Regions:
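FAD/FMN-dependent oxidoreductases across multiple families
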Residues: 247-249, 255-257, 271-359, 363-395
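C-terminal helical "tail/cap" subdomain of flavin- and related membrane-associated enzymes
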Residues: 359-553
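Predominantly flavin-linked oxidoreductase catalytic cores and closely associated redox partners
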Residues: 135-293, 353
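Glycine-rich FAD pyrophosphate-binding loop
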Residues: 36-61
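Short beta-strand to alpha-helix junction loop
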Residues: 68, 113-134, 273-278
Length: 553
């Protein structure tokens, strides 16, 4: 599929006008397309070790998107026709608190009964990356598949004309390329991270296993209860990312356009050791105990198993992702990775690729890049640190059908109300705006930590008996409107008002969460939550209209 590497002595046509991307997966190819879109005269080279076309279905995980990543693919990169024609529209997140249960209709279901306004997608990574590779070649990007990077010699950051030198091998021939900018998009191999000693652990200790089945897994077929089946319109629960939950874990079911289904277990490393599930047979034994309905569905499809893999201790940070004077960057999993829950991987690709594109723009314009690199890196790490408390020490809550739906509501409101607003309204790359918002964003980050701590304490205080019920996110008018409003185009005053309103809503939601928990466990300490409100006086005001979900049949 690729172009053909010329003779081994080749240098780039114009190294000073070249960006070289190591890694031609989702992060690398989307960055290449974004650079080509922004700078038609820029030479963009992508080196990918895998041969194209890559296999459908059993290629890579990271198959579900949420709103930032979905917007990046569909609108920023213009991939909406491909998403509509060749991928699946996602029916939101859906949760069943069914550990050990034989019938889904007997437990709490959390999800939307109908599609919300702002779309997201389920991605067959093989289909998508083949299309990205095709588009790269069509648009004049030099995409070299089957190409192994052998050595990297970084440019001298003190010499503005110094270039990076990358030796790579394809079909037995070695070539040395030069580039002004070098980006590592090569995933967990972390070539630059290892070379520069940038690896950084975090406190989130979790593992994951996954596999693909060459068949559709439709949870609606697991029940004959007419009322339960009628809850959703359209009746297509299979298009959701379905989460089957229990203490310390969640199992994903993600449909793929190729006709396969992706299945995974993500779990706290202590509660569910990886050694109990790191082969397909062990995973099946684990399902037999924790998810008997899923076990029965998989047991009859053993002959349709397409692959199996696992990651131990999958979450990590990074000491540095952008270097302005050095003109290098990390994107995707070559930098940081949080957790598969809430599918933040594509979001962070969208954000880092956009920052990298802006850094290249500043450099091409002859402006000093160091300041922008430092600011963008600070923002990027702040977003990572903002989301990390959503996961760290929170996996026990997956087994709590009372607290977890409240946590999901909070997490979404925080994501849509703050993080998405910054991305959709192009504020993340506006250094002036981000400077003015620094204190506000730090304060709401502190509130998020306080709420996460409170939710964990609520879960530890006790468990109520689960009952059959539907918690319908689409029934919350304010929640559906928050989702719809993501695509509004706002001028500066309207954005400021939007953010102020959303912070007030987060304050109110935090206080209502405290009130609901105190109705059961009045001894819970909520002082940290109250002290972190954007408006401390709000705790003395009436709580207003109920923002929390109420069960339906």
């Amino acid at each position: 599929m690729s172009t053909t590497l010329p003779n081994p002595s080749l240098s780039s046509k114009d190294p000073q006008n070249t960006v070289l991307v190591m890694g031609g997966g989702l992060a690398g190819l989307t960055l290449a397309l974004q650079l080509r879109q922004r700078f038609p005269a820029l030479e963009v080279v992508v080196l990918e070790r895998r041969r194209h076309p890559v296999p459908e279905a059993a290629h890579k995980v990271g198959e579900s998107t949420v709103e930032i990543g979905a917007h990046y693919f569909a609108s920023v990169l213009g991939l909406k026709p491909h998403l509509l024609d060749s991928q699946l529209k996602k029916f939101g997140f859906r949760f069943f608190f069914n550990d050990g249960h034989a019938h889904l209709e007997d437990v709490t279901e959390l999800g939307a009964s109908t599609f919300l306004s702002t779309p997201a997608w389920q991605l067959d990574r093989g289909i998508l990356e083949n299309e990205l590779g095709r588009l790269a070649l069509e648009r004049g990007i030099r995409f070299e598949d089957g190409c192994m990077v052998r050595t990297v010699e970084l440019a001298d950051p003190k010499d503005k004309l110094s270039t990076h030198r990358i030796a790579c091998e394809r079909d037995g021939a070695t070539t040395t390329l030069q580039a002004r900018w070098l980006v590592d998009a090569g995933g967990r191999a972390g070539l630059l991270k290892r070379k520069l000693g940038l690896a950084q652990a975090n406190d989130h200790n979790a593992n994951a296993v996954w596999f693909r089945i060459a068949d559709k897994l439709d949870v609606n077929e697991w029940s004959s209860d007419a009322a339960w089946l009628a809850r959703c319109n359209p009746p297509h629960r299979w298009l959701s990312t379905n989460h089957l939950c229990g203490d310390g874990y969640w199992t994903w079911l993600i449909p793929l356009a190729s006709g396969s289904h992706s299945v995974g277990i993500v779990c706290d490393a202590v509660t569910h050791p990886i050694e109990t599930m790191n082969t397909f047979e062990k995973a099946m034994d684990w399902f037999a105990v924790h998810q008997p309905q899923l076990y029965a569905q998989l047991d009859r499809r053993r002959d349709k198993l397409q692959d199996f893999a696992f990651f131990k201790n999958f979450s990590y940070g990074c000491k540095q992702v952008f270097d302005g004077p050095g003109r290098w960057a990390l994107t995707g999993e070559a930098g940081v990775f949080l957790d598969p829950f809430y599918s933040p991987g594509s979001d962070f690709i969208a954000i880092s690729n956009t920052f990298i594109t802006e850094l290249v723009a500043q450099d091409l314009a002859g402006r000093p890049v160091a300041m922008y690199a430092d600011i963008y890196q600070s923002v990027y790490f702040s977003l990572y640190q903002t989301m990390l408390p959503i996961y760290t020490n929170q996996y026990r809550i997956f087994g709590n059908a009372e607290v977890m739906p409240v946590k999901v509501l909070w997490d979404y409101t925080y994501y849509w109300g703050v993080m998405c607003q910054l991305y959709f309204q192009d504020k993340l790359i506006d250094v002036g705006a981000m400077g003015r918002l620094q204190k506000t964003l730090a304060a709401v980050q502190t509130l998020n930590v306080a709420v996460q701590d409170f939710l964990r304490a609520w879960d530890l205080a006790g468990r109520s008996v689960d009952t059959p019920r539907m918690l319908d996110q689409a029934s919350l008018g304010w929640f559906a409107e928050l989702n719809r409003s993501l695509t509004d185009r706002l001028d500066a005053p309207a954005f400021a008002q939007r953010l102020q309103d959303n912070l007030a809503q987060l304050d109110t939601l935090a206080l209502q969460i405290v009130a609901r928990a105190h109705a059961q466990y009045p001894e819970l300490d909520a002082s940290a939550v109250r002290s972190c409100l954007s408006d401390p006086d709000r705790s003395s005001l009436p709580l207003g209209d109920n923002l929390l979900l109420e069960p339906s049949a």
